[in-house]
Amino acid sequence: MEGTFSMNGLIRRAVVAAISVVAMTGAIAAPANAGILTASAKDCGDESLSQPFAQFGDKAQYKLVQGADFEGSMDDWTLLGGAKVVAGNESWQVGGSSDNKSLVLPAGSSVITPASCVGLAEPTVRFFAKKNSGLLSTLAVSVYVKTSLGLVVPVPVGVVLGNGQWKANGPMLIVANLLPLLPGDRTPVAFQFTPLLGSWQIDDVYVDPFRYK
């Protein structure tokens, strides 16, 4: 687990620096050569897996990103621009009937998760989201990966649309699964959520580490 914790700090520092550049340029650039994103992690540790999206027809096994139910500690999260935990859970309470919190992302804010380990076989990220304001607002999702050269780089994952109600976002493919990792390798990644032209809430962020069928 030490590798995961050290990766948390490395990714967090690199991401904050990257966001400072983004704030000045107004855009997130994808790495010029995604083929060099080959760093793997051998010490990611075991995780507790569940099927939080089974009621939506998704029987895959997922693990909760550290703290991503927003019910406890937010250690190792990076909250920027007014992002904060608020009362109000996603409607299905997949994490438990006592869950009653989520993360609000005002316009101009952003959040970066702690590092989570994923494998080669089609890893995906899935979560709940709700648009609070902005007719044309969307929620941008990126993943930060450490390359074989030791660089932490952002790779866009996708954009979420909303209609003012909580919804279980469909599985989003993590670009890291296209990288030339060896079978059995695992690599730590961190996710960034950024609202565009409005305010959003997110809750219960899960990763499918091995894409179980």
Tell me the role of every PLM-derived stretch.
Residues 24-32:
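C-terminal segment of classical bacterial N-terminal signal peptides
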